[in-house]
Regions:
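Cyclophilin-like peptidyl-prolyl cis-trans isomerases
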Residues: 3, 10, 20-229
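Hydrophobic helical h-region of N-terminal Sec-dependent signal peptides
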Residues: 8-12, 16
Length: 229
């Protein structure tokens, strides 16, 4: 199958859209592991952030923490069989301004062992892989389908399997740049407070603000996010 048919045959995975789209930009890298406390109206969540595996993503998140961007935001999207998402809207469901988005690091993070498993933190984005800014989500189940799709060696790629179909002799650049293959960048993991995540996960949802569904009927407030180390 030729490359144009491959791209046409693929469906775009954009279920974790932030509703924002900006040109990509890079942020300074940092090293090591940081720890943050996410204080919510349902309790505290602590998480490790892996700057050694997703440096731009962690630096971006910590800059928002330093700017107190997350203080007073809500978990605006809760799907009990999927994830809980927040970091972009205030308690009145007004979208907060953000800095320019960051370069996607999902493949780098995946190669370093970070996958969308239960309890991990990942960046939300639009259909553009390089559109993540402030919004993040916590996986409440294993979501392997959100992981970046590995690209086999070779150019053209002799054989590539995707969504149950096999494609042959596909130009490598078409696969590397195909938006639907990027997945979502994991950058941290909950180390304590999964019981709080479970409470958020279980909260009743419905329509709210600009959203037709999946909004907690009782707002789940992010009171603050604090860097512990």
């Amino acid at each position: 199958m030729n490359t144009s048919r491959f791209i046409a045959a693929c469906t775009l995975l954009a279920s974790l859209s932030t509703g924002l789209l900006f040109p990509p930009s890079a942020h300074a890298q940092s090293n090591g592991i940081s720890k943050v406390r996410i204080s919510t109206s349902m309790g505290d969540i602590e998480a490790e952030l892996y700057a050694d595996k997703a440096p731009r993503t962690v630096a971006n998140f910590l800059q928002y923490v330093n700017d107190k961007h997350y203080d007073g935001t809500v978990f605006h999207r809760v799907i009990s069989s999927f994830m809980v998402q927040g970091g972009g809207y205030d308690a009145k469901y007004q979208q907060k301004p953000t800095r320019a988005p960051i370069e996607h690091e999902g493949r780098k993070a995946l190669a370093a062992g970070l996958k969308n498993t239960t309890g991990t933190l990942a960046m939300a984005r639009t259909g553009d892989p390089h559109s993540a800014s402030s919004q993040f989500f916590i996986n409440v189940v294993d979501n392997a389908f959100l992981d970046p799709t590995p690209i086999p060696d070779g150019d053209p790629v002799a054989k590539f399997e995707y969504q149950g179909r096999v494609y042959e002799n596909v130009a490598r650049s078409q696969l590397v740049n195909a938006p639907q293959l990027f997945g979502y960048t994991v950058f941290g993991k909950v180390t304590s407070g999964m019981d709080v995540v479970q409470k958020i996960r279980s909260t009743p949802t419905g329509a709210g603000g600009p959203f037709p569904s999946d909004v907690p009927k009782t707002p789940v407030l992010i009171q603050s996010v604090t860097l512990l180390k």
